[in-house]
Amino acid sequence: MQLVDLAFSERVLRTVENLDFSLVSGGSASNTIHGLAKLGIETSFIGKVSNDEFGSIFEKDMTASSIHPILFRDEPQTGRAIALISPDSERTFATYLGSAVKLSADELTLDLFKGHDLFHVEGYLVQDHNLIERSLVLAKEAGLTTSLDLASFNVVVENLGFLQSIVSRYVDIVFANEEEARSFTGLPAEESALKIAEMCKIAVVKTGPKGSVVATGGKLVRIPPVDAKRVDTTGAGDLYASGFLYGYANGLSLEKSAMAGTILAACVIEKIGAKIPDECWPDLIEKIKSL
């Protein structure tokens, strides 16, 4: 992921305007919340958009997915991530954060968190230390379980001390891929999971085609992969978090929760984009319920 300014973002859009593309609401936490909503969990989303076309699309997509949008408004433009996918299914992002980074800690209140059971936050918010820390403080004050996706290895490297501090003080569940986990601990996947779980309640490290590992209380659970034909890996980690948090919220074991995440991740990488098509969800829900 590469952060870019508005001018560069528009230049990229002009460069690729003749390629096939789709336009959907996105963002790591947004993708995760969409997955949870599709699984039948009542959800809300806190964020900031602008009064522009992208902001309208974002809000309508949230509402259509039965997500309660708690959206503040500001200028200059709604943030956007341009996902560029290579023939071997890998992807990179040119991300213009726009009004998303205008969300301030002062705008968050305890009432926004009341009535919920779990708060999931993406590591990209670490751009504003005060915002991410206040959101976690309020979530804990409201009695919520908290989860954090580390987002990107470069985000971890640039904010290591701060991330380690908030994980140890406010976070119950950490999600990371191998690169992010190594950046966070300096250790390979399994050792990283155990190390991170010393700082929080549960650590999940996703290891791509090898599956994932989950650590808690000094114990490690290894989760095998599910066969899938990789087309686009965008959203794989986000949908894994959807499945895992669904399982956790419904009292499933860590192994079954991780398998739920694996099932969703395997499905989304067979599609273009970070969302699973509506027609796929009935079968996925049955698979997860049968765990």
Name each model-derived stretch:
Residues M1-L13, S56, V213-R222:
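Acidic-glycine-rich active-site phosphate/pyrophosphate-binding loop
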Residues M1-S44:
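Glycine-rich phosphate/adenosyl-contacting loop at the front of the ribokinase-like
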Residues T43, P69, T146-S147, A203:
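Hydrophobic beta-strand scaffold residues
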Residues D61-P76:
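A glycine-rich helix N-cap at a beta->alpha junction
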Residues I70-R73, A83-V126:
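Conserved phosphate-binding/catalytic loop of the ribokinase/pfkB sugar-kinase fold
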Residues V137, A142-T145, A151-R222:
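Conserved phosphate/ATP/ADP-binding segment of small-molecule kinases
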Residues G161, A189-L291:
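Conserved phosphate-binding/catalytic region of the ribokinase-like
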